Amino acid sequence: MINGSIVALITPMNSDGSVDFASLERLVEFHIDQGTDAIVAVGTTGESATLPMNEHVTVVAQTVKFAAGRIPVIGGNGANATSEAIELTKSLSKVGVAAMLGVTPYYNKPTPKGLVAHYKAVAASTDIPQILYNVPGRTAVDMKPETVAELVGVSNIIGVKEATGDVSRVKRLRELCGNDFMLYSGDDATAREFLLLGGNGVISVANNIVPKAFKAMCDAALAGNAELAASIDEPLRGLYSTLFCEANPIPVKWAAHRMGLIECGHIRLPLTELSEQCHGLLLDAMTRAQIEVK
């Protein structure tokens, strides 16, 4: 099973909006070198909402190719039409992903019954492990632990990414879903506590720019060393909040560009590049997190 420090990878782009595959390859190498445990390709942070399906599949496939078996790649397969999610899932099943991460259908606000039916239909279209993804702040639907529990019996649904920031859900999910069901935090600010309470890993935005420290924090928390985990995590807490001074992934892309990790900080409309009033805030947070900028 995939656990530990997982990066929600940005999708680097050229100034004309095309995907910058040279920078993508460098990012994959960077995370392998820094010890990251797995990569999520083309999730929320990877701008899945603005990549058409053929481009989405290509970016995931290239990420798998660059990884070359050295680090697991999880492909984002979420959509708000079940038929589209199934089509995407079938395409991703052919490119070598270790698992897929499917966000709850957004905007159309399905009922719990609809969520269960959606995920069962998607899971039935592939043998690849599936991870549920709950982020109500973006989707307008909250998949409660009781709904997640209805999907535990589906053999290739292996876990959930819980991005509400409500760490009380760790205990409830564990009670309802059992010890073998994987629980991933999707909220950097509460990730340490999430792991110490019994979570298995973190799918992280900050991990794009502080992978070594984030890996060390995750390892310490998973080992039950709360003191060590806190000593690593506390200096990063200002960074966690500042990376959401505007909608993700606007700030983290800007930061990655300032670090020289990607050639260009371009982001696709309707998102725009980081506002000037946030530049100083983010630079200050990066400095306090001991991140070198160029």
Curated annotation (Swiss-Prot):
Task: For this UniProt record, give its keywords in alphabetical order, as a comma-separated list.
Answer: Amino-acid biosynthesis, Cytoplasm, Diaminopimelate biosynthesis, Lyase, Lysine biosynthesis, Schiff base
Highest taxon, organism lineage? Bacteria
Q: Name one GO molecular function term.
A: 4-hydroxy-tetrahydrodipicolinate synthase activity
Q: What Gene3D superfamilies does the record point to?
A: Aldolase class I
For pyruvate, which residues are the binding ones?
Answer: 45, 203
Cellular component (GO) terms are: cytosol
* Site (Part of a proton relay during catalysis) residue list: 44, 107
Q: Where is the active site?
A: 133, 161
Subcellular location field: Cytoplasm
Which pathway, metabolic or otherwise, does it act in? Amino-acid biosynthesis; L-lysine biosynthesis via DAP pathway; (S)-tetrahydrodipicolinate from L-aspartate: step 3/4
The keyword Lyase appears for this protein: yes
> Which PROSITE patterns does the record associate with it?
DHDPS_1, DHDPS_2
Enzyme Commission (EC) number: 4.3.3.7
Q: Which family does it belong to?
A: Belongs to the DapA family.
Role of this protein: Catalyzes the condensation of (S)-aspartate-beta-semialdehyde [(S)-ASA] and pyruvate to 4-hydroxy-tetrahydrodipicolinate (HTPA).
Q: What is this protein called?
A: 4-hydroxy-tetrahydrodipicolinate synthase
Q: Which species does this protein come from?
A: Shewanella sp. (strain MR-7)
Q: What gene does this protein come from?
A: dapA
